């Protein structure tokens, strides 16, 4: 097997089948790999990461590996470090929220954030929504905070700000008002929820791309 088709260690090389080796050593920049549970997705992803670096196709800080849980992210880092004799601290390996948080802390000015912005957990976010609703004299028996919270998070995850949401009925209009009030208070306090991390990171990247073209 040639250098271009080799992996970082014989142990990992022997643990991959032909299809997995093909996925790890693809020359294409983009590829969609479909695989079921327990099929070795993490092994392939981390081996691909290591292969790109070992063959000097990419630098450690230019490769992004994203997963859904902190446990999976830690496992990826351990597997990569087992194949590469380098410091993993500068690598972009983590969860969606974790990586967005790290990116925004690095580019807080471009993202219109204070340098030391804070992240609200689910309980804090719900409390913040309740405060906004109380200030607006919204009866929670008629419009539960849980429903409003779902509305806000869903729109943020779809990339929609309060000003962009089109409301056609009284309930939707009230939810939009609460969403807007929540945005204003969070911005003033220098805090944001988990969905805000994703949305603000997306907006910053789009804005940066538009400026560079």
Describe the function of each predicted region:
Residues 2-11, 28-31, 36, 50-213:
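A basic/glycine-biased coupling hinge at the interface between accessory DNA-binding modules
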Residues 14-25:
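Pre-Walker A adenine-sensing motif
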Residues 41-42:
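Conserved lysine of the Walker
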Residues 45-46:
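Post-Walker A alpha-helix
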